[in-house]
């Protein structure tokens, strides 16, 4: 596409946005933009201020890029440049734009798909950094993207908060959408539920079924643990699953734990989810965390070459050593470092601990208590705090109690004698036995380690 073509479709994109927005919204956000230049697969747009650029890119950049793709058939990246005196209002397109429109009617540009997935543009395989702890899950995801509906169907990706489940799921969606003519639909479990309730109230359930049962070739649902204790939604998901599975459509779910542990999900849904492959994402190791930070710095410099940053290897290592909770915290720390560099021009290693004190575990007060662990474990296993600490010896209580003992030994500095007192006055030998039981099971049950990592993450979150 030539430069005029980019400008034409930019103006068409704004026209479409105007028709879909309120007048107040359009005048506040979109009337301040104007076309500056185009490059290969990129358009530079003028905005009135740096504050406006930050707010606008967070709220509307992906929406504009999707709309441009729908109209032109060409994917683009929007680049924003602050230009003082940006003209306001809906200015008429230049004469050369009208000429181009007459010769190249946008209506003649075929739409690539009948449905455009609402995917995060950064969640691709290219941006996913795979280490030893994610190698199997990464390989499975690539296999599904190359053979949707045939290998590993359904695919369930589970793990703790901020470990990359959504990224890996959406990377599959991006790849299938890019390389096939299949319709990819991505939705969070909560939005699936909200949409279903809305169609019930408006008596448009057929529209809902058409979208999820008949339009979808690939269905991605994030956070299916949301469906626990929601019988009506589970019923709808069950029939949607059956319809897609029988037609060999690809189904991908994410969850915060193995599906067998979703005790308030119907047994028939748990059974359906277990038909394919379940794979877990664990905490990234130190080397992987370093690689993730380096990759994100490279991506930032590629996206914003005019304000590229330099972060030394020493800073990268220091951050990676002190943030081992999840990738989301790494991203948050990097964002803060970038903001500091934009203001100060550079960053040195001696500044990092104070700058990132809320992220660094070593800088946080040690407030993890046995009581905190007991509450987290009780909530996770859906049992009462008093039962967990009490004298009950049925299996549904003893096993979570042993897990709580194991976590307490790892996350606190109490002796086994002190832990025995915390666990209702038990003997220290009971604590030792419980911890040894869990240590032994870790060797034979890989999913247990993922579950323990999830619980550790929840404990850390509870003291923030």
From Swiss-Prot:
User: Does the record carry DNA-binding as a key word?
Assistant: yes
Q: Where in the cell is it found?
A: Cytoplasm
GO MF, one example: DNA replication origin binding
- Provide the residue positions that the database annotates as binding ATP: 162, 164-166
Task: Identify the stretch(es) annotated as Domain III, AAA+ region.
Answer: 118-341
Q: Where is this region: Domain I, interacts with DnaA modulators?
A: 1-74
Please indicate if the UniProt record lists Chaperone as a keyword: no
Question: One GO CC term of this entry?
Answer: cytoplasm
UniProt keywords (A-Z) are: ATP-binding, Cytoplasm, DNA replication, DNA-binding, Lipid-binding, Nucleotide-binding
- Name where it mostly resides: cytoplasm
Spell out the residue ranges making up region: Domain IV, binds dsDNA. Answer: 342-464
* Domain II, as annotated region: 74-117
Which biological process terms from the Gene Ontology are attached to this UniProt entry? DNA replication initiation; regulation of DNA replication
Q: Its biological function?
A: Plays an essential role in the initiation and regulation of chromosomal replication. ATP-DnaA binds to the origin of replication (oriC) to initiate formation of the DNA replication initiation complex once per cell cycle. Binds the DnaA box (a 9 base pair repeat at the origin) and separates the double-stranded (ds)DNA. Forms a right-handed helical filament on oriC DNA; dsDNA binds to the exterior of the filament while single-stranded (ss)DNA is stabiized in the filament's interior.
Recorded domain comment: Domain I is involved in oligomerization and binding regulators, domain II is flexibile and of varying length in different bacteria, domain III forms the AAA+ region, while domain IV binds dsDNA.
Report quaternary structure and partners.
Oligomerizes as a right-handed, spiral filament on DNA at oriC.
User: Into which family does the record put it?
Assistant: Belongs to the DnaA family.
**Know the name of this protein?**
Chromosomal replication initiator protein DnaA
């Amino acid at each position: 596409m030539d430069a005029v073509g980019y400008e034409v479709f930019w103006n068409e994109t704004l026209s479409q946005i105007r028709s879909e927005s309120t007048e107040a919204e359009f005048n506040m956000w979109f009337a301040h933009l104007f076309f500056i230049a185009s490059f290969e697969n990129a358009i530079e747009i003028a905005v009135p201020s740096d504050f406006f650029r930050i707010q606008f890119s967070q709220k509307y950049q992906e929406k504009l890029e999707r709309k441009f793709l729908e109209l032109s058939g060409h994917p683009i990246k929007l680049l924003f440049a602050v230009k003082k005196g940006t003209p306001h209002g809906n200015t008429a397109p230049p004469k050369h734009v009208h000429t181009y429109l007459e010769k190249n009617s946008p209506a003649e540009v075929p739409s690539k798909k009948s449905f455009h997935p609402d995917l995060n543009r950064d969640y691709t395989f290219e941006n996913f950094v795979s280490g030893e702890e994610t190698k199997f899950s990464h390989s499975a995801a690539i296999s599904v993207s190359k053979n949707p509906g045939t290998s590993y169907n359904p695919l369930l990706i589970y793990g703790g908060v901020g470990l990359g489940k959504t990224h890996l799921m959406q990377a599959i969606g991006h790849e299938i959408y890019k390389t096939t003519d299949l319709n990819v639909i991505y939705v969070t479990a909560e939005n699936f539920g909200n949409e279903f309730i809305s169609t019930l109230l408006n008596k448009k359930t057929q529209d809902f079924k058409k979208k999820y049962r008949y339009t979808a070739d690939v269905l991605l649902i994030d956070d299916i643990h949301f469906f626990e204790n929601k019988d009506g939604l589970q019923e709808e998901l069950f029939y949607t699953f059956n319809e897609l599975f029988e037609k060999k459509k690809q189904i991908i779910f994410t969850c915060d734990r193995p599906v067998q542990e979703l005790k308030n999900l119907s047994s028939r849904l748990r059974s359906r989810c277990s038909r394919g492959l379940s794979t877990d994402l664990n905490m990234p190791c130190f080397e992987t965390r370093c690689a993730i930070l380096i990759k994100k710095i490279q991506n930032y410099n590629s996206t914003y070459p005019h304000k590229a940053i330099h972060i030394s290897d020493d800073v990268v290592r220091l951050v990676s050593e002190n943030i081992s909770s999840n990738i989301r915290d790494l991203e948050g720390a990097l964002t803060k470092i970038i903001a500091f560099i934009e203001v100060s021009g550079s960053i040195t290693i001696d500044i990092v601990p104070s700058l990132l004190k809320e992220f660094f575990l070593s800088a946080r007060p040690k407030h993890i208590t046995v009581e905190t662990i007991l509450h987290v474990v009780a909530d996770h296993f859906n049992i009462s705090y008093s039962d967990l600490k009490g004298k009950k010896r049925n299996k549904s209580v003893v096993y979570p109690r042993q897990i709580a003992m194991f976590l307490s030994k790892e996350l606190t500095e109490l002796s086994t004698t002190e832990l025995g007192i915390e666990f209702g006055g038990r003997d220290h030998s009971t604590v030792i036995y419980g911890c040894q039981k869990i240590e032994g099971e870790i060797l034979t049950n890989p999913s247990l380690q993922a579950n323990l990592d999830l619980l550790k993450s929840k404990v850390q979150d509870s003291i923030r």
